[in-house]
């Protein structure tokens, strides 16, 4: 596999920023389909792909979501073209006969809800990371958020309890003029070991 050009790494990582202010430019539904059709190929344990994505675009759906957000995240969510509820399916293992057919992977989880939830959260979080990178690769900016009332989101959007919110991410076309200076990151020596 060839190494990506530096410009591609810049778009995905080095020059990419978390956005909180958005241009008044819509995100087409077709692009959201392309986004998911890219994300779904990211690796997960046993191809479990437990993440579920709710693309909140309409004014009516936004008005349901905004009261679930913390005060500091309400206006940015209102302004963003799309707010994505990144959720996970607490019954993802029921899809394993289709997604991982060469062995009985469903039996690894059946009847153990704690194990199901842990695997769903871990692998769904991986997929949420893929969503960030795929969005950036497709020319979109992202603003992941943890400031929301998870119980309220679940009650509002997932009343049957099968899906659970993991985090929420605004996507669209960010206003680069409104970015703050970039915060520092830990060095290799601070964050890594080679053993």
UniProtKB/Swiss-Prot annotation:
Its EC number is 1.-.-.-. It is an enzyme of class 1 (oxidoreductase). Its cofactor is FMN. It comes from the Bacteria. Coiled coil: none annotated. Keywords: Flavoprotein, FMN, NAD, NADP, Oxidoreductase. GO terms for molecular function: oxidoreductase activity. It holds the Pfam family Nitroreductase. Gene3D superfamilies: NADH Oxidase (3.40.109.10). InterPro entries: Nitroreductase (IPR029479), Nitroreductase-like (IPR000415), Nitroreductase_HadB/RutE (IPR050461), RutE-like (IPR023936). Belongs to the nitroreductase family. HadB/RutE subfamily. This is Putative NADH dehydrogenase/NAD(P)H nitroreductase Rpic_0870.
């Amino acid at each position: 596999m060839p190494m990506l050009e530096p410009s591609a790494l810049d778009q995905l990582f080095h020059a990419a920023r978390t956005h909180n202010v958005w241009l008044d430019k819509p995100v087409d539904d077709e692009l959201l389909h392309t986004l998911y059709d890219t994300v779904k190929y990211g690796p997960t344990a046993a191809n479990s792909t437990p993440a579920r994505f709710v693309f909140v675009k309409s004014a009516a759906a936004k008005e349901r979501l905004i009261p679930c957000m913390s005060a500091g995240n309400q206006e940015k969510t209102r302004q963003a073209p799309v707010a994505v509820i990144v959720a996970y399916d607490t019954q993802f293992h029921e899809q394993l006969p289709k997604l991982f057919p060469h062995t009985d992977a469903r039996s690894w989880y059946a009847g153990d809800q704690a194990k199901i939830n842990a695997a769903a959260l871990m692998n769904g979080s991986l997929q949420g990371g893929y969503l960030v990178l795929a969005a950036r690769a497709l020319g979109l900016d992202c603003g992941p958020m943890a400031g929301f009332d998870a119980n309220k989101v679940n009650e509002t959007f997932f009343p049957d309890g099968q899906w659970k919110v993991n985090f929420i991410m605004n996507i669209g076309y960010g206003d680069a003029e409104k970015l703050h200076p970039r915060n520092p990151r830990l060095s290799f020596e601070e964050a890594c070991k080679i053993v």
